[in-house]
Design a protein with these regions (language model features):
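Bacterial N-terminal signal peptides
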Residues: 8-16
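Sec/Tat signal peptide C-region and signal peptidase I cleavage site
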Residues: 18-22
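Exported/periplasmic ABC-transporter solute-binding proteins
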Residues: 23-103, 108-115, 124-130, 138-139, ...
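Helical hinge/lid and interdomain linker segments adjacent to catalytic or ligand-binding clefts
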Residues: 118-120
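Short beta-strand
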Residues: 155
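A short alpha->loop->secondary-structure connector
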Residues: 151-152
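Bacterial N-terminal signal peptides that target proteins for export
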Residues: 1-7
Length: 327
């Protein structure tokens, strides 16, 4: 019966195509954000639900803007961990339940938002929400403390490393960073202008193949169109792979693990430690924060055993003093 229905549906679609009747395209899979289907929204009252994946969504802006008691600017490469982290924080601090707002766009763009007084525009919407805490790479956090944008000491909490994200089954048989220079491999790579991870990637390319490999990936392949530069790699790279626009892209290991966990057709190729680059994640209170006590509570929580156990689900490692890295 199912086979007959499928054949009937196919016949109807074929007739519609021949007659010029428009059809709603059938999605290849549920590949478009928000990948956690609203779990990263902390609002207690969501009102009217209107989210159309690929068309109308704000996947990296979370919570209720009305009167938040804690505002977090979080580097986007652990957007997926924020829902369980916030849930655990609220269990320990119930006064904050439903009152936390956070953004997970690239850290460099979050710095621009800090400097703009918290004002940001996405599509046709402009709003202002000033951060209480900023969380990104340790080097960036220390730099912002030096500039006076952040205050107090940096709080390091976890480390992460790079991987090569590919489509499920690894159809191009990519085994190493050197393979990224192959002419038959299309790449999605973070843009150094917007995304700090590009610096770590370029360092790893240098370890794997010297300046020649770096120039091939970020020079020749960009110039000939076989590499596209992303502006928000934690969204674009997996999407470009699933849409068969790219064959590979270097990302943080945690991002690939998350894609595998949610069942998207993504896998990853490990990069040897000798060629890899480690990032140390840290946070600090924003100077002049409207909710300084809340910021300090979050920074204390983020390195707690409960928070670290959540991070470890996605391949992060707890920060150990003296660990190499810092980006």
């Amino acid at each position: 019966m199912r086979a007959k229905l499928a054949l009937t549906a196919a016949a109807v679609l074929a007739m519609a195509a021949q007659s010029g009747v428009a059809q709603t395209p059938a999605p290849k899979a549920n590949i478009f954000p928000p990948w956690q289907h609203g779990a990263n929204n902390d609002a207690l009252n969501r009102g009217v639900e209107f989210t159309v994946p690929q068309i109308d969504d704000l996947a990296d802006f979370h919570g209720d803007l009305t009167d938040p008691k804690l505002v977090l600017y979080v580097g986007g490469n652990y957007f997926f961990a924020m829902a369980p982290l916030v849930q655990a924080f609220e269990a320990a601090h119930p006064d904050y339940k439903g009152r936390i707002y956070w953004e997970t766009i690239p850290p460099g763009l979050l710095v621009e938002q800090l400097k703009a007084g918290g004002r940001i525009t996405s599509g046709n919407m402009t709003w202002t929400v000033k951060a209480d805490a900023y969380l990104a790479g340790l080097r960036a956090v220390n730099g912002l403390i030096g500039q006076g944008l952040l205050t107090g000491a940096a709080t390091p909490y976890v480390t992460n490393k790079l991987t090569i994200m590919v489509r499920a089954g690894n159809p191009k048989h990519i085994t190493s960073l050197a393979d990224l220079a192959r002419p038959d491999v299309r790449l999605a790579m973070p843009n150094p202008e917007y995304e700090g991870v590009a610096r770590q990637i370029k360092a790893s390319l240098g370890k794997a193949g010297g300046d020649a490999l770096d120039k091939a990936v970020y020079g020749s392949k960009v110039a000939d169109g076989s590499a596209v530069l992303t502006r928000i790699h934690h969204r674009q790279t997996p999407l470009f792979l699933m849409q068969d626009v790219a064959d590979a892209g270097v990302t943080w290991q945690s991002e690939a693990i998350f894609q595998e966990q949610v069942g998207n057709p993504i896998t990853h190729v490990d990069i040897p430690d000798a060629q890899n680059t480690t990032a140390i994640y840290a946070g600090a209170e924003v100077a002049g924060a409207q909710h300084p006590q809340a910021a300090r509570a979050w920074l204390e929580f983020i390195r707690s055993p409960e928070a670290l156990s959540i991070f470890e689900r996605y391949g992060f490692k707890p920060y150990a003093p003296g660990a190499a890295g810092g980006d």
